[in-house]
Amino acid sequence: QNYETNVQQAVMDAFMANNTFASVPEALVQKYSDAAESSITSMASAYGVDADTFTQYNYGQDLATFLSTYAEQTAKQDIALQAVANKENLNISDEELDRMLQDRATAAGYDTIEEYIGETSKEDYREYFLYDKVLDYLVENAKITNN
């Protein structure tokens, strides 16, 4: 990992450690659990193993334990990042989303956004771009010290 990635991870860890949650919407947790399970199942299949074996090997946990922990942490992170986006006016407008997607589509050699995103929804891309935008904001405003 490079320095920037380490800084981003440290900032995100500190940010999340300073957030508390009374509860997390079950639908949001389920959304992340389903997405992770689909991704893991696909990767496991590519390696010729089942999803449980894959998560045990890569994460040291059975699939159900990994999904439960991962989905809850990701849902909490999503809520916290959205709160920062709302407070700091960092939300991504439809126009900004289209511009970002068009830039990526063009760079990747696609004629249209639709060809570029395929089966993925624009909202999934909005979430992805928002994560990066808020993380950049947090890093820019963090007080970073070298230990």
Which sequence ranges carry the predicted segments?
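Extended, charged alpha-helical "arm"/coiled-coil substrate-binding scaffolds
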Residues: Q1-N147
